[in-house]
């Protein structure tokens, strides 16, 4: 039975883990790292790079290197947060065919789900390389504060990558699951999760294998990327003040600034000061310009202090919704790379009044929890019950544009709730059910999840028809809505798909593209391997001709030179079949030459004097050891 893998699909980095017996193993990728940058690049030659390979070439290819795309997943192009992101990244964020925010590289448009699918495919390959068998099922994590559109888009990404997503699980819940598997860890815990692009906080009760989420809160547009942006802005402003040149308008310089900002931020977690040195960052009429600047930890903290403070308000709301005080929290778990920053640790310590737990790896704990949940779903781990919640209230628009809640935020899922509504006008033949998610009082101020019509209502005065609207949220946090006319029994049901979102046809097309690309990647790899083999063989045969030419017949020499020439010609092109054919011919010639050399060597008379360096004969002589005592 194949394993279920646990994937932490992060904004900045991703991680994959599996359950082996009673232990969870975080898997190393092909580069030997336990986390993989969530980056995709498209090169001039049409090659697609994922992870570290994409990150390495980002400075020279900024417009076609895509990162932090998770911040766009499930969002409309007109979303104000998307407009903010457009100014921060060197690649193009464009309007998708469905009105969602998509990205563009090398003239091609990609849905964020598609880009995420490339990262998930890399995680899938990592697991398959370790297990030595195909992997088809996964548990994927999302920020707890993701809405329905974002969850659905993440599930779509899994499908595009060829994975059956058994469960979408909230990141803080996954972290708590990993932490609580040690039976000693019980009580009311807070998970503070500050990652690359999102912030979440969850309050959970753990005990006797039951993990019950009491409340969750967060901000899906607050994370390490925003901290980096502050440093980039500071560096660019300082350079502009000194040199009069705005580096933010230069994509290449902006990418170099981003790398430097990220590196400086990490270094300042363990040092008080760091130097940023970027030679030849730009040039003007007077010549090349260099950026050299010292950045202290104190300066970094002053640049990002308001961002850290922004994380505390969701913490207050989460405590209030859970009905507990900070003093009742027994443990605080830190998740996400940003929680390594001393100022963040200090803020969390002050808020909760206790030292955060340090016995979890903030980069790996979420993937570990996802792997545990995968094992629970497979039945490999028993006596574990996970009770999660929906992060946002769900409801419909009623008369006057009011948002009428059917399911309140922090309701345990899965759940189902019904309410009866009526018509607003006499003889109304149909009703439109508009579904929203959020906490504002007016429907238009919340996130629209979609709408559908219930038609064929019999004529009746306003207020008489009874229309029962039912909301059903599954364990993934994904919403189904139905409306039923109680008089006629007529029913209309939809699985909510955002007004944008990807249709099944879109997903199927992207799956086929992913499969086609996988085949193209395989062909490209085969061509590279064939080139390496051909070049190595050419070198070997040429060496033998040069060093042992006198032992090889002229006819064989001519055949070898012809085969070498044919192989060199094939090496100039991209035809794998032609290169394979030329290499096979050269390989046969190489064997023939090898046999001739061996034969010539074995036929040489033993003891025949070999030529010395100056052409004279060198003779092997017998000698007798003389005992000096006998001749004294």
Swiss-Prot record:
CDD domains: ASKHA_NBD_HSP70_HSPA9 (cd11733). Keywords: ATP-binding, Chaperone, Nucleotide-binding, Phosphoprotein, Stress response. The modification Phosphothreonine is found at residue 198. One of its GO terms (molecular function) is ATP-dependent protein folding chaperone. Induction: By stress conditions e.g. heat shock. Residues 600-632 are annotated as: Disordered. HAMAP family: DnaK. PANTHER family: HEAT SHOCK PROTEIN 70KDA. Belongs to the heat shock protein 70 family. Acts as a chaperone. This is Chaperone protein DnaK.
């Amino acid at each position: 039975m194949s394993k279920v893998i646990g994937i932490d699909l992060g904004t900045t980095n991703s991680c994959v883990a599996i359950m082996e017996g009673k232990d969870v193993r975080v898997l190393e990728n092909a580069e030997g790292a336990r986390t993989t940058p969530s980056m995709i690049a498209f090169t001039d030659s049409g090659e697609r790079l994922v992870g570290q390979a994409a990150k390495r070439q980002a400075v020279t290819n900024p417009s076609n290197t895509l990162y932090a795309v998770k911040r766009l997943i499930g969002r409309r192009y007109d979303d104000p947060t998307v407009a903010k992101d457009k100014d921060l990244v060197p690649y193009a964020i464009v309007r998708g065919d469905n009105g969602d925010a998509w990205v563009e590289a090398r003239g091609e448009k990609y849905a964020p789900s598609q880009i995420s699918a490339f990262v998930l495919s890399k995680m899938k390959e990592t697991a398959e390389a370790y297990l030595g068998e195909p992997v088809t099922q996964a548990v994927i994590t999302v920020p707890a504060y993701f809405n329905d559109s974002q969850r659905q888009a993440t599930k779509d990404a899994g499908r595009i990558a060829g994975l059956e997503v058994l469960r979408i699980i909230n990141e803080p819940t996954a972290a708590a699951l990993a932490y609580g598997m040690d039976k000693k860890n019980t009580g009311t815990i807070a998970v503070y999760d500050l990652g690359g692009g999102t912030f979440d906080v969850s309050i959970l009760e753990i005990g006797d294998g039951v993990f019950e989420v009491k409340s969750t809160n967060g901000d899906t547009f607050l994370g390490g990327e925003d901290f980096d942006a502050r440093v980039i802005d500071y560096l660019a402003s300082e350079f502009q003040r000194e040199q009069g040149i705005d580096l933010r308008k230069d994509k290449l310089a902006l990418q170099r600034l981003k790398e430097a900002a990220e590196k400086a931020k990490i270094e300042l977690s363990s040092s008080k000061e760091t130097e940023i040195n970027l030679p030849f960052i730009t040039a003007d009429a007077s010549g090349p310009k260099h950026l050299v600047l010292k950045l202290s930890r104190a300066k970094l903290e002053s640049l990002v202090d308001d961002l850290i403070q922004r994380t505390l308000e969701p913490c207050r709301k989460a405590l209030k919704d859970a009905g507990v005080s900070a003093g009742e929290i027994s443990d605080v778990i830190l998740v996400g790379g940003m929680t390594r920053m001393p100022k963040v640790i200090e803020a969390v310590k002050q808020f909760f009044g206790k030292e955060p737990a340090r016995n979890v790896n903030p980069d790996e704990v979420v993937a570990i929890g996802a792997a545990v949940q995968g094992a629970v779903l497979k039945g490999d781990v028993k006596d574990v019950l996970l009770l999660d919640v929906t992060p946002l209230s769900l409801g419909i628009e009623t008369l006057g544009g009011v948002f009428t809640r059917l399911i309140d935020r922090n309701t345990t899922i899965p759940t189902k709730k019904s309410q009866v509504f009526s018509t607003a006008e006499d003889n109304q033949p149909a009703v439109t059910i508009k579904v929203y998610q959020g906490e504002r009082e007016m429907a238009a101020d919340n996130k629209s999840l979609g709408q559908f019509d219930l038609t064929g209502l019999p004529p009746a005065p306003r207020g008489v028809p009874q229309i029962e609207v039912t909301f059903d949220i599954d364990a993934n946090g994904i919403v189904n809505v139905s409306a039923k006319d109680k008089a006629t029994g007529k029913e209309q049901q939809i699985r909510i798909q955002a007004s944008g979102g990807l249709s099944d046809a879109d997903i199927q097309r992207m799956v086929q593209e992913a499969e086609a690309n996988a085949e193209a990647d395989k062909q490209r790899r085969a061509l590279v391997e064939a080139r390496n083999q051909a070049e190595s063989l050419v070198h070997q045969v040429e060496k033998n001709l040069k060093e042992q030419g006198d032992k090889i017949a002229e006819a064989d020499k001519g055949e070898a030179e012809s085969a070498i020439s044919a192989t060199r010609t094939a090496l100039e092109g991209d035809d794998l079949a032609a290169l394979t054919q030329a290499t096979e011919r050269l390989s046969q010639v190489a064997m023939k030459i090898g046999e001739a050399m061996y034969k010539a060597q074995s036929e040489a008379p033993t003891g025949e004097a070999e030529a010395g360096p100056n052409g004279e004969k060198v003779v092997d002589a017998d000698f007798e050891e003389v005992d000096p005592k006998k001749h004294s």
